[in-house]
Amino acid sequence: THTVWAFDGYTANPADYPAFRAVADFNTTHAAPGNTTGWFMPSAGQLWDVLEHLGGVKALADQRTNGDQEWYGTDPGNDICASLNRWLAHVTDAAKFGDSYNWFWSSSEYSGNVARLWRVRSDGYVYCYWNSKGISRDVRPVLAF
C-alpha cells in the first residue's frame, strides 16, 4: 500500500480529501518529537498491522494474502476498541476509540475520489473497503521513530 508522507508534496486539492487536510492541520497543533517522522496518515497496510498486533485481531493473520477489494472478518470475544485503547493510556478520553465502533481513513488511495476506509467494532468485527473521500470519518494520525 502507498502512504502519502508529506502534505507539501500532495498535488491534489486538499479539500477533496478532508482526512488528509486533518492530518496536516494536526501537525501544526500537535508538535511531534524531533526524532520521529512527524504525524502522518497511515496506509491501509500499516493500519492492518496496528489492528492485528495492537488490537489483537487474530482474524487478520489469516487474510494477509487476500486480494479482495473489500474485506471483513470477525474475532469473537475481542473488544477491538478496548484493546486499542489500552495502548492509548496517555491520551485524553476524547481521543480514544469509542465504546462500540469506529471508522477511520487510511492514506491508501484507489483513485482521485476513493480511498481505503477501516471500521472496527467492540464485538470483534473489522471491515476494510474503498469509499468516497468526501465521507466524514475519523483519521488516526501516527508517527514512527
Describe these PLM feature segments:
Residues 1-40, 44-59:
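Short aromatic-cysteine micro-motif
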Residues 44-48, 53-145:
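C-terminal, surface-exposed recognition/capping segments
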